[in-house]
Amino acid sequence: MSKQQMRPSKFSDIVGQKDVVDRLNIVVRGCISSDGVMPHTLIDGPPGLGKTTIASAIANELNVNLYTLNAANIRNVKNILPYLMGMAPRSVVFIDEIHRLPKTVEEFLYPVMEDFVLNITVENKPENIDLPMFTMIGATTSGGSLSQPFYDRFTIKEHLSFYDENELAKLARSNLSKMGIVLEDSDLLEIAQRSKGTPRILNARLQWYKNYKICHPNDNKSIGEIFDIQGIDSKGLDLYDRMYLETLQKSKGNPLGLKSISSITGIAIETIENSIEPYLVRKGFIIRTQKGRILGKP
């Protein structure tokens, strides 16, 4: 089953992030009632918590076109112009990893977002081109990396939090049902406990479970044993997590910086910051200090 098939299409289908979804639903209903345009929206939070899902649900609720871009692929203004000039009125333009936009593109978007006007140069002459009113939705794992003027142009700002285990178990039940799989509540909870509070990781765990049962239909291994084979322990830690923690353990209490950890483990700094550390910090496995990272006492 594809990610798109697993992804909720409406607010009512989204499990978790209730406060965020409720607030956005109020704004969306108000826009529909007043025949208005959804304000520009910034969604911040760790990877895999549903930023893309929420953006897609907003467009579906508004019944408007959705244009999806990744800022990593936008190197200059020319990369984004076709979308801005070709979009239908009231469209949603969703930019994932928006903190990666070059500053020149950020600055170009100021009048686009504020006045719905393109300021471009044609044959060495400045021209202003009116655009249809639209909604820009930005997703980021690093809201503080946006320039202040760009950040301020997002009227709505929401932060996504990690899921609790009961929410993930509920989501697991829903997604497994789409695969034709039914599990006991205790098994659902155990999978949830191994998913780091993150729906994207949960879905990867579910896919592993499904594949394992396809290959071993008569196997009676427990949930724990099935995930032990994948290298996922009872706390959800994987090979990279353990490499990270073992590196700190070998430092014998001496703080290690990101560059040192990356050099020793071979794991990219961005992966450490965005995918490994948030969960380890939240669960108390590590402590960030001014001098570097040290082991905590979970």
Please give the residue ranges for each predicted region.
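C-terminal helical "lid" of AAA+/P-loop NTPase domains
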Residues: 189-194, 200-215, 243-246, 260, ...
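Terminal-proximal interaction/regulatory segments of ATP-powered molecular machines
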Residues: 252-298
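Conserved AAA+ ATPase core "coupling" helix
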Residues: 25, 145-179, 184-193, 204-205
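AAA+/SF3 P-loop NTPase mechanochemical coupling elements
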Residues: 122-139, 154
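Conserved AAA+/SF3 P-loop NTPase catalytic/coupling segment centered on the Walker-B
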Residues: 57-58, 77, 89-120, 143-153
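Conserved C-terminal helix/linker of AAA+ ATPases
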Residues: 188-189, 206, 210-233, 241, ...
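Dynamic helix-loop-helix/coil hinge segments at AAA+ ATPase domain boundaries and subdomain interfaces
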Residues: 2-23, 233-235
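Walker A/P-loop
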Residues: 29-71, 82-89
